[in-house]
């Protein structure tokens, strides 16, 4: 999956690339990395292979994932699968990335996810968050992290 100015492009081996314009995305974007979750209700999930895929050993680099979303015109539920690299994904960062994508879509600014400069700035701010006090919702943590 590639985030571009005009929308998300799904690259699937052997088939033509599929462009999903930002205007079709509604209600946010969920992220699951790895497999093995049963749907916790959170927008960002890190399954068992997602956890193992960042550790040294035979699972390193395994456990791709998917972006899940509801599209309009026509209405449909979609999952766009992706491969992963062998870097470690902190559960906090997966959750905050999902929250960033969801809040950006909810604000009517889905196109910003295709703006490389803005996305780099936002992700850079989220990388500074390592944990947060119990009881704080990801939305509040995200808003505080992106505040100038």
Regions found by a protein language model. Name each.
Residues 1-2, 11-18, 27-148:
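Eukaryotic intrinsically disordered, low-complexity regulatory linkers and tails enriched in Ser/Thr/Pro
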Residues 21:
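Acidic (E/D-rich), amphipathic helical modules within compact regulatory domains
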